[in-house]
Curated annotation (Swiss-Prot):
Subunit structure: Part of the 50S ribosomal subunit. Contacts protein L32.
Organism encoding this protein: Natranaerobius thermophilus (strain ATCC BAA-1301 / DSM 18059 / JW/NM-WN-LF)
Lineage, opening ranks: Bacteria, Bacillati, Bacillota, Clostridia, Natranaerobiales
Record key words, sorted: Ribonucleoprotein, Ribosomal protein
Name under which the protein is recorded: Large ribosomal subunit protein bL17
GO cellular component entries: cytosolic large ribosomal subunit
Length: 113
């Protein structure tokens, strides 16, 4: 499986992506760097696809990845049914421009309505 390193080792990268994905699904919109937004988008799409299946096994699989049980409940009760007819493309990455402090390219990641 290919992925971006995000200048972190495996454990740090995994923790960062878990936390960002959980925050994104909780708030339905986050602002982060472009590289992180693209990686979180991939993971969020997989979580929403699991939520569309709505089985006990898929719920447990989402619980093993996401860090908050309330987010899993929201994912399976609100977000999953909303995208039931849609075949992928649940998220959108909007480029925002460079960050003030270090010039890192920023992006807004949001759910498609």
């Amino acid at each position: 499986m290919s992925y971006k390193k995000l200048k972190r080792n495996k454990d740090q990268r995994k923790a960062l992506l878990k936390n960002l994905t959980t925050a994104f699904l909780r708030d339905e919109k986050i602002e982060t760097t472009e590289a992180k937004a693209k990686e979180v988008s991939r993971l969020a799409e997989k979580m929403i696809t699991l939520a569309k299946k709505n089985t006990l096994a898929s719920r447990r699989q989402a619980l093993s990845y996401l860090t908050d049980e309330d987010v899993v409940t929201k994912l399976f009760e609100n977000i999953g049914p909303k995208f039931q007819e849609r075949q992928g493309g649940y998220t959108r990455v909007l480029k925002k421009g460079p960050r003030q402090g270090d010039g890192a390219p920023m992006a807004i990641l949001e759910l498609v309505e």
